[in-house]
Structures are given as structure tokens and as C-alpha cells.
């Protein structure tokens, strides 16, 4: 059996990464999703173990000390990390694994695993990113401003990625993401 491939999906908050990933997971059975751990509070409707593994800062720091993360980083005041053991299990079973992580984490994965396929997802403009973040109604204006400042840095780094999906039209972006994932699991050039 052929080993799966590691896929990193990154981009600014509000780009639509999660929605596009869910569409790809539904369409491509050879994919698995790596559930990240985080110290941030759950959003309405999020389920522990499905959307994230929600940990206290103390628990998360213990996992760091124990070497349980493939990568971890701090983003907007919260810690996020990829549990290593689950990723390895998926890859060994022949599934390609999607990691949805921020730029710092994506860079760490690229250093550790240069064979990882890196996909950058973004909204068509900073104004659209702002509109989407404000539409969530889950964050303060200060938090939105911090995420927008981070988005500028993230978009500036998009050339570090193998593929870019501009989520300006959901159906088009969805089809593009699914096609990229199909090429990855087939062992081909993704972009």
C-alpha cells in the first residue's frame, strides 16, 4: 500500500478554509482530516474532538513538553498544534492527511516535512476578509483588527505555497480544491 501524503491548508481567518476542506473530504474518500488542538474557546456549534481538541493552556503546554505535536504555534493569543501520532497513523494507512494550520505552523511543517503539499486559501481582498470576520459575530472589534493585521502578513507569504485557491466564488473554489486534492491522492503534481 502506498503511504499517504501530508497536505497543509493555510491562509487568513475568514478565507473559507474549513468550508473548502469539508467539501474536499466529502468528495475524496482517500483524505483524512487532522483535528488540531487549541487553547481557544469553542465557537457555537463546535464539538470537542471533531472540530478541535480543546485544551487548557496548562494541558497544551504539557503536550508540548511531552513532544506530542508535529507542530505548534501561537496565533491571536491562543495556542494551536497538530497531534503527531494521529497524522502518522493516517499516512501509514495510505490516507492523505489535511492539516488546517496557520502560517507559523505551515512553515514548521515545511521544514520538518519538505514533501508536504502546501495550499494557500484566501479571500479575494482584505475588505472581503473583514466582512467575513465581522459576519461571524464571534469576535470583538479588537480581535477582528488583530486578525486583519495577521492576514496582511499571511497574504504576503503566499508565494511560499505550492498552490493558491482564491475563494471569491464558492462553487469555483470548491471545484478547484477538490481537483487539487484528487491530484494529490493520485500521486501527481497538485497544481
Curated annotation (Swiss-Prot):
Localization in the cell: Cytoplasm
SUPFAM superfamilies: P-loop containing nucleoside triphosphate hydrolases
NCBIfam families for the chain: guanyl_kin
Entry keywords, A to Z: ATP-binding, Cytoplasm, Kinase, Nucleotide-binding, Transferase
Catalytic activity: GMP + ATP = GDP + ADP
Enzyme class: transferase
Record carries keyword Nucleotide-binding: yes
GO molecular function, one term: ATP binding
Purpose: Essential for recycling GMP and indirectly, cGMP.
Cysteines paired by S-S bonds: none
UniProt EC number: 2.7.4.8
Positions of ATP binding: 11-18
Name of the molecule in the record: Guanylate kinase
Main location: cytoplasm
Family: Belongs to the guanylate kinase family.
Domain named Guanylate kinase-like: residues: 4-182
